Amino acid sequence: MIYTAIDNFYLSDEQLKASPSRKDGIDETTEISLRIYGCDLIQEGGILLKLPQAVMATGQVLFQRFYCKKSLAKFDVKIVAASCVWLASKLEENPKKARQVIIVFHRMECRRENLPLEHLDMYAKKFSELKVELSRTERHILKEMGFVCHVEHPHKFISNYLATLETPPELRQEAWNLANDSLRTTLCVRFRSEVVACGVVYAAARRFQVPLPENPPWWKAFDADKSSIDEVCRVLAHLYSLPKAQYISVCKDGKPFTFSSRSGNSQGQSATKDLLPGAGEAVDTKCTAGSANNDLKDGMVTTPHEKATDSKKSGTESNSQPIVGDSSYERSKVGDRERESDREKERGRERDRGRSHRGRDSDRDSDRERDKLKDRSHHRSRDRLKDSGGHSDKSRHHSSRDRDYRDSSKDRRRHH
C-alpha cells in the first residue's frame, strides 16, 4: 500500500521493485533509463518554455510518482513528460498553453530523432489528437495522485543547512546542482526532502573536501540518519555512471509528436522484429520500411499479402507490380489530400461563421429599423390623439360654461 498524504508520497524498496512496469515485463535497466529520459525531456522542455526551475522540479516529481502507480508499457514517456510540464506550470502559477507545450516537445523530438524541423500545422488532425492526448494524460495523472499534487523540494533546505554549517559559498551551487540531478532518480519517492538535502550537502562537501562536524553528528540536527545519507550518495554516484539515456519504445500505444514517418519507421521496424522474427530474412529493407509506413496509422504490423490486397483495392497499383514500391508515395499523397480537405473544412466553417455573424448583424439592423418605425408611428399617433383630445376637451369645456351661463341667465329673468 502506497502511503499518500498532503506532503509526502513514499515507497519502500520492495514496492519500488514490484512496480507496475516490472509486472508488465520491463526490466530494471530499461525502467531506470526511461525515467531518466522523461526527466531530461521535462528539464529541457521547461528551459525552452522559459519556465522557472521550480516548475521543472515539480514536473519531475509528478513524473516519478506517476510511474510508481502506472506502467511504462501503458503510458508513453513522451506524452507523460509533456503533461507533467503542463500540469506543473499550472501548479507553480506559471501556466503555459497546451499549444506551446506541444510545439516545444515536437521540436525536441525532431532534434532528438534527427528529423527535419517541420512546421506544426495547428489545424491538422494530428495536432488535435495530440492536444486531446495531452489533456487525457493530465487527467490520468491527477486521478492517480488523488488530486494531491503538493510537492516539497530539497532545495529550500539546502541554504539553511549550509548557513548553519558555515560552509564556503561554492558549496551551495554544487549542492543545488546535485539536488536538481536527484530529481532524475527515485530518491524523491523514497526519502523525505530533508534527507535528500542532507545527502546532497554531504556529497558536495566530499567533492570539495570540506569537513563537516561529526561530534555530535551534524545530520542528527536535521532529522536524518547516516544510512539514508549514504544511500542518497550511492544513487547519485550510480546516476553519473550511466550513459546518456535514449528512448526505448516499450509502450504499445505510443504516439510521436512528429508528423514525419521516420520516427514511426523505427518503431514499426522494432515491432516487426518482435512480432515477425523471420520477416527480416524474407523481405528486404525497402519492404520493411514500406510496411512500417503503411501501418503507422493503425499502430499494427501487417503481412505483405495484406498490403498487396489493400493496394489492389485502392487501385493505385496493378496486380503485377511490387507490393510496396509506391506505398509510401501514395500514402503521402493521401495524407496531403486529407490535410487539404481538413483545411477546406476549416475554411468552410470560418465562412459559415462569418455568414452567420453577418446574418445576425443584418437581423439586428432590420430589428432596429423596425423599432424606429414603430416608435415614429407611435409618436405620431400620440401627437394626433393629443391634438384631437385637447380640442374636444376645450370645446366640451366651453360648451358647458355656455350652457351654465345660459341657464343662470334664464333663472335671473324668471326672478325679475
Curated annotation (Swiss-Prot):
Region annotation Disordered: where it falls in the sequence: 286-416
SUPFAM superfamilies the record matches: Cyclin-like
Location(s), subcellular: Nucleus
Annotated Basic and acidic residues bias: 304-315, 328-374, 384-393, 401-410
GO molecular function: cyclin-dependent protein serine/threonine kinase regulator activity
Pfam families, per database record: Cyclin_N, CycT2-like_C
One GO cellular component, as annotated: plasmodesma
Domain of life: Eukaryota
Disrupted gene: phenotype observed: Lethal, due to male sterility.
GO BP term (any one): response to salt stress
Keywords: Cell cycle, Cell division, Cyclin, Meiosis, Nucleus
Function: Cognate cyclin for CDKG1. Required for synapsis and male meiosis, and for the proper splicing of specific resistance (R) genes. Involved in regulation of DNA methylation and transcriptional silencing.
Family label: Belongs to the cyclin family. Cyclin L subfamily.
Subunit structure: Forms a complex with CDKG1. Interacts with MOS4 and associates with the spliceosome.
Entry protein name: Cyclin-L1-1
